[in-house]
Amino acid sequence: MKRALFALPLLAAWFLAACSDDRALNDVIPVADPLREPARAAPFEYGRPGWIGTDPARAAGSAGEIEAFADAAENDPLWTHPRNPVLLPQLQIARREFREALGVSPRVPSAVAARAFAGAAAALRQNNEPAAVAALAPVGGAATFARLSTLPRLPRVEEAAQAVANEVNGRGRNR
């Protein structure tokens, strides 16, 4: 028993040391819901005028997040019972608005679209346009890539992003 009590402060010191280096706390303690952090950041990412501008990497990443949020609201047990009953329709409308702006067919499954947009965003952050076009092949390829730089304002996307943040940050909600 004394050994266990002696080990407790050492364990606490080790944990605090692990948390104090430059890595994010999420590297030490994984988040159960991978959409929680993007949801919390959504109002800051989507809530400003000109939030996309002419940045195709940001546009692709945002399209991928909206696809992932909509898919989660339809299928993920952590998201299928929201406090806000209009969250799912808001996300479906936002997904449709984003897809129409990018020329993506409504028949493309959300998981496929989310992977395509995430792959394109990663390639664009590395300045690899051919890889981005290849990643976008399932959702329209070069035509979709060309539209990433010329997106109009997407008000339904902005509203849905705020609703997602409210869902995650609301009282009594610890995802």
Regions found by a protein language model. Give the residues of each.
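Sec-dependent bacterial lipoprotein signal peptides
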Residues: 1-19
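Bacterial Sec signal peptide processing site at the extreme N-terminus
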Residues: 13-36
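Mature extracellular/secreted ectodomains of secretory-pathway proteins
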Residues: 46-175
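Residue-level signal for the start and early helices of compact helical domains
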Residues: 7-10, 37, 89, 139
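Long, hydrophobic N-terminal alpha-helical segment
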Residues: 28, 32-58
